Amino acid sequence: MKKFLALLLALVMALSLAACGGNNTPADDQQGDNNGDSQYPEYFAGMEDLIAAAQAEGELTVYGSCEEEYLTAACQHFEELFGIKVNAQRLSTGEVQAKIEEENGNPSADVWFGGTTDPYNVCAAEGLLEPYAATNASHLISDMYKDADGNWYGIYKGILGFMVNTDELTRLGLEAPQDWADLLKPEYQGLVWLSNYNTAGTAKLVVNTMIQKYGHDEGIQYLVDLDKNIEV
């Protein structure tokens, strides 16, 4: 891993997103906030040597597992702040996990950004992630939003659920399922769609959630029963 670039992006990306989403002040207008001592915002004080080293490398490669628009905004703001070209590739969390494991010892990306936590935990346990101390980690409202060893930090959270096609349900004369248990009903056979557990981080999260919801054995049985209704 290109250490300078990886550390710099890890320290900055969440801050960049805050500027993209909740502050319309252009990046150029934010520079120089550190009492004239730096051309960068004040939270980068003392990082000038690190930034210069990253700029000397010139480019950054990012695997992004968040929404495309979110990833693009973060990378664009990073480029505006530091003048470092960002090459971003949008992949599912499971796909990134597979690439990182395949590239073990010869990584082609500097940073993994966004996605669900389960694949991050797997890669961390395999020693494939570089721990770092994020500048704003103390602002996270709970320790559950970061790895205890600093391998990853949460930048957003979401709610796991399922969507229904109301037009299709009307055509078939079916009521919409109201909870996860309803998805096992025989009338939904062949109507449930779910991503591949091996490649999609969200599908892995479904497995994790069902085990937490029902317990290990019942959770696994739920997934076995759900498989009978999944469209092939």
Over which residues does each language-model region extend?
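A short alpha-helix/helix-coil micro-patch that ends at or immediately precedes a cysteine
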Residues: 74-82
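Short, low-complexity disordered leader/linker segments with a strong preference
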Residues: 1-57
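Extracytoplasmic ligand-binding site segments that recognize negatively charged/polar headgroups
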Residues: 61-75, 87-103, 107-232
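Hydrophobic aliphatic residue packing
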Residues: 12, 84-86
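Acidic/histidine-rich, surface-exposed loop or edge segments in extracytoplasmic proteins
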Residues: 56-60, 81-82
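Low-complexity, compositionally biased segments
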Residues: 26-27, 31-32, 36-40, 80, ...
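Short alpha-helix boundary/capping motifs
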Residues: 22-29, 82, 106-107, 151, ...
